[in-house]
A protein has these predicted regions:
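Short beta-strand elements
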Residues: 693-717
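Short proline/glycine-enriched turn/loop segments at secondary-structure junctions
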Residues: 672-675, 695
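Glycoside hydrolase catalytic-domain context in secreted enzymes
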Residues: 1-670, 678-686, 690, 717-718
Length: 718
C-alpha cells in the first residue's frame, strides 16, 4: 500500500535540508550533486553513493535474491505479487545498507536509492532492454509499477524503506546504438496515451521518490534537460516533489551527441535550470564555472540540492538509530529462506503456456528416458537477464529436471548447438552436435528443447559478450542453429516440448506448427530451473499471460526508429499476431458466465464489471480475469486492457469477480494529448484474453461482451 506522508515530518525535512545546504560552500554543494557524493566532515555529512540497482532484486552488490527478470514478472499479471517483490527488494536493500555502513562501506550499489523500476513501454520486440520493463501496455505497466514502488518504499509515514526511481523518463525504447544522439519524435496523442501514463501513475499514485531522465531527446529536447518533461509536466502538472537524476553520463551527450549545447558548462546549466537535481557522472563539476558565468544561479543549485537532502532525510540518514524503524533490519534478511520461497513462488507464477496438444503435463511414472537438448538447458546466464544480482545457488533447467526426476527417470543431455555462433569448438564443423541431438532423441521418450536468448543477445548498448555490438536484436528469429536443432528433434518423431528462455518475443512459427507444446519461461531467476520442471511435470499449473505481442516476423513491424504507435503493439496492430498480448493457456479450463455492469454509463466514479469464473477442469488453477475497452467509432485503438484481477480456483469451484473501471478507462487522447471521454458506445470485454480473433481461436472461447453508452462528451484532467 502507498505510504501516507506525515505532513509535520515533511515540513521538518524541508527545513532541515535547506538549513544544511545553506551551510555549504558552492564547491561543497556541487560535489553533493554527483552520484558519488563525498563526505563533508565539518557538517557531519557521510559520503553517499546514489547509484543502486534493483529491477528484479538488488543488483551488482554481492549475494542477493535474484528474482525473474521484470518482463517475466509482468507475465504473472499479478499486482499483489509485484508488491511482495518490491518489498523484498526494499528489505534486502536495507539489510545490505545497514550491514555495509557498519563496516564503513559506502560504495556504489550498496545504498538505499534504488534505480528501479524501468517503466518504459516495450513498443518494439527488437529493443534490447525491453526485458527490463513490464511489457508493451501502459495500463499493465502502470499497475505493476505502482505496486512495485509501494512495496519497495514501505508504509511508514515518517521514513522510506528505500527510495524507488521511475526510469527512463519518458519516451525511450531504442535503438540502443543511437541513444546518445537519437531524437524520438512523438505526437502529443501518443505521448499522453502511451508513453506518459505509467510515469504519471507512479508519481501521483505511488509517490515514487525519484525519476530518472533518459539518454535520448524527445521532440528535440534532451530528456535530462527537457523543460517540457521535467518542469512543465513532472514538476508543474504532476506536482512531483521528489528528486530527478540523469541517466549515467547522459548530460555529456547534450554537447557530444545531441549537439544542443556548445560544451559542458552550457550542458550542466541546461540540466539544472530545468530541474535535473543529480548527475550520474561527473559533469556537474562544471557548475561552479556555470555560476561564475551567470548561466545558472546558486539559488537553482540550492533548490536541487535541498530536494536531494530531503530524500536522504526521508531515508533516515540524519536521524538517530532508534528513530528509524528500518535501521533494525539485519543482514539476515538477505537471501533468507523466506526470500528463496518467494522467489520460487514468483518463478512458478511467470510460466506462460503458449501451445499444448495434451503432451503437458508430463507424467514421470510413464517415462524411462527424457532428452534435454539446447544451449539454454544448462545455462545460468539464461536464467538472469541484465542488472542481476548474485544468487547463492542457481538451478538451470537441466538441473531442475534432473532434481525433479531423481533416479526414477534417466535424463540424456546435449547442448545441441552454440546459442548463436556457427559452432561450439572453433575447429569443428558447423553445427557439430546435430548427430548427438539425433542420438539423444532416439533414446528418449520425450524431448525437451531449451532454446531462446540470453542477456548477451539482448541488453543495453555495449553489453560485454554481445556479438551484435549493441543491445538490440537484429530480427525475431531464433539465433544461430537453434531452429535446425529443433527440427532435428521434431523429425525424430518423439514428442517435443519447447521451453523458451528470453526476455522478448521471437517469431517461433516453425515451433508453433510442429512442437507438441511451448512453454515461455522468460528469464526465470535463480530458481528458474525448479519452476520450469514443476510446470512441465504438473507440480504447478502455468498461469502466465503474455505482456508483449509475439509477431510472425519483424516484417510485421514499422521501422524501429519510428516512435508513432500506428501498427505497433496489440493496441494498434492491424495484422494477426502469432501469440497475442494477454494470451496464455492452463492445464485446466476456466468458464466465464453472468458478466454484468453496475451501470450502463460510466459516471464520475466509473462503474464495476462482475463475472462468475468456474474451474471446469480436473486440476487447480489460477486465471487472469482481463477487462478490455473499445471505443466503437472510427480511428480509435483496438480493445485496450483496463482492468485485471487474479483468481484461484479448485476443480469445480466458482467465484464471482468484480473489477472497477474508472471513468478514465473510457478516455482517449485527442491531438493535443487531452484525455476525452466521447459520447457514444463502448464495448467492454471480460474474460481470459483479448477479444481478437486469434486469441479466441487459441483460447477456444471468446470473452463476454458488454456495452456502455456515454451520453455526453467530457474532457478529463489527468
Amino acid at each position: 500500500m502507498k505510504r501516507t506522508k506525515n505532513p509535520a515530518k515533511e515540513a521538518e525535512y524541508r527545513k532541515r535540508a535547506a538549513d544544511l545546504v545553506a551551510q555549504m560552500t558552492l564547491h561543497e554543494k556541487v560535489g553533493q550533486m554527483l552520484s558519488w557524493a563525498p563526505a563533508i566532515e565539518r557538517l557531519g555529512i557521510p559520503a553517499y553513493n546514489w547509484w543502486s540497482e534493483g529491477i528484479h532484486g538488488i543488483g551488482r552488490a554481492g549475494t542477493a535474491t535474484v528474482f525473474p527478470q521484470a518482463i517475466g514478472m509482468a507475465a504473472a499479471f499479478d499486482e499483489d505479487m509485484m508488491e511482495q517483490v518490491g518489498n523484498a527488494v526494499g528489505v534486502e536493500a536495507r539489510g545490505k545498507y545497514n550491514m555495509c555502513r557498519t563496516h564503513g562501506d559506502r560504495d556504489i550499489f550498496k545504498g538505499l536509492t534504488v534505480w528501479a523500476p524501468n517503466i518504459n513501454i516495450f513498443r518494439d520486440p527488437r529493443w534490447g532492454r525491453g526485458h527490463e520493463t513490464y511489457g508493451e501496455d501502459p495500463f499493465l505497466t502502470s499497475r505493476l509499477g505502482v505496486r512495485f514502488v509501494e512495496g519497495m518504499q514501505g508504509d511508514d509515514p515518517d521514513y522510506l524503506q528505500a527510495a524507488a526511481c521511475a526510469k527512463h523518463f519518458a519516451v525511450h525504447s531504442g535503438p540502443e546504438s543511437d541513444r546518445h544522439h537519437f531524437n524520438a519524435i512523438v505526437s502529443k496523442q501518443d505521448l499522453w496515451e502511451t508513453y506518459l501514463p505509467a510515469f504519471r501513475a507512479l508519481v501521483k499514485e505511488a509517490g515514487v521518490e525519484a525519476v530518472m531522465g533518459a539518454y535520448n531527446r524527445t521532440n528535440g529536447e534532451p530528456c535530462c534537460g527537457s523543460k517540457t518533461l521535467l518542469k512543465d509536466i513532472l514538476r508543474d502538472k504532476w506536482q512531483f516533489d521528489g528528486h530527478i537524476t540523469s541517466d549515467c553520463w547522459a548530460i555529456k551527450d547534450f554537447h557530444t551527441g545531441h549537439m544542443v549545447t556548445d560544451g559542458p558548462v552550457e550542458s550542466v546549466a541546461l540540466a539544472v535550470n530545468n530541474g535535473c537535481d543529480l548527475n550520474c557522472g561527473d559533469l556537474y563539476v562544471y557548475l561552479e564555472q556555470a555560476v561564475a558565468e551567470g548561466k545558472v544561479s546558486e539559488e537553482k543549485i540550492d533548490e536541487s540540492l535541498t530536494r536531494l537532502y530531503v530524500t536522504r532525510m526521508r531515508l533516515g540518514m540524519f536521524d538517530t538509530e532508534d528513530q528509524v524503524p528500518y535501521n533494525k533490519v539485519g543482514y539476515d534478511v538477505v537471501d533468507s529462506a523466506e526470500m528463496k520461497a518467494l522467489n520460487l513462488k514468483v518463478a512458478d507464477s511467470i510460466m506462460t503456456l503458449l501451445k499444448n496438444d495434451g503432451t503437458l503435463p508430463l507424467d514421470k511414472s510413464k517415462l524411462h528416458t527424457v532428452g534435454v537438448i539446447g544451449p539454454n538447458a544448462d545455462s545460468r546466464k539464461a536464467l538472469l537477464g541484465n542488472y542481476e544480482g548474485t544468487a547463492s545457488r542457481y538451478t538451470t533447467v537441466l538441473e531442475g529436471i534432473e532434481d525433479y526426476l531423481g533416479d526414477d527417470v534417466k535424463v540424456r543431455y546435449s547442448q545441441g548447438c552454440h546459442l548463436y555462433a556457427d559452432n561450439i569448438h572453433g575447429l569443428a564443423e558447423s553445427n557439430e552436435l546435430l548427430s548427438e541431438v539425433k542420438g539423444v532423441c532416439e533414446e528418449s521418450d520425450v524431448v525437451i528443447a531449451v532454446l531462446g536468448l540470453d542477456s548477451g543477445l539482448e541488453g543495453e548498448e555495449g553489453d560485454k559478450g554481445n556479438q551484435f555490438a549493441s543491445g538490440d536484436k537484429p530480427n525475431l528469429k531464433l539465433p544461430g542453429h537453434q531452429e535446425e536443432v529443433l527440427k532435428a528433434c521434431v523429425e525424430s518423431g518423439k514428442p517435443v516440448v519447447l521451453v523458451l528462455l528470453g526476455g522478448s518475443a521471437l517469431a517461433v512459427n516453425y515451433a508453433d506448427e510442429h512442437a507438441n507444446a511451448i512453454l515461455e519461461a522468460w528469464y526465470p531467476g535463480a530458481r528458474g530451473g525448479e519452476a520450469v520442471a514443476r510446470a512441465l511435470f504438473g507440480e504447478t499449473n502455468p498461469q502466465g499471460k503474455l505482456p508483449v505481442t509475439f509477431y510472425h516476423s519483424d516484417r510485421d513491424l514499422p521501422e524501429f526508429t519510428d516512435y508513432a504507435m500506428k501498427g505497433r503493439t496489440y493496441r494498434y496492430m492491424e495484422k494477426e499476431a502469432l501469440y497475442p498480448f494477454g494470451y496464455g493457456l492452463s492445464y485446466t479450463k476456466f468458464g466465464f458466465k453472468d458478466a454484468a455492469l453496475s451501470a450502463n454509463e460510466a459516471g464520475a466514479d466509473g462503474l464495476d464489471v462482475t463475472v462468475s469464473v468456474t474451474n471446469e477442469g480436473a486440476v487447480a488453477g489460477r486465471e487472469s480475469v482481463e477487462v478490455y475497452v473499445k471505443a466503437e467509432r472510427e480511428n480509435t485503438p483496438n480493445a485496450q486492457l483496463k482492468g485485471l484481477v487474479k483468481v484461484d480456483l479448485q476443480p469445480g469451484e466458482t467465484k464471482q469477480v468484480k473489477i472497477h473501471l474508472p471513468l478514465a478507462a473510457f478516455a482517449l487522447c485527442d491531438a493535443e494529448g487531452t484525455p476525452i471521454v466521447e459520447a457514444g458506445s463502448y464495448s467492454v470485454y471480460v474474460g481470459a484474453s483479448q477479444p481478437d480473433a486469434r486469441s479466441v481461436a487459441l483460447m477456444g472461447q471468446a470473452p463476454a461482451k458488454l456495452t456502455v453508452t456515454q451520453s455526453a462528451t467530457q474532457a478529463l484532467d489527468l
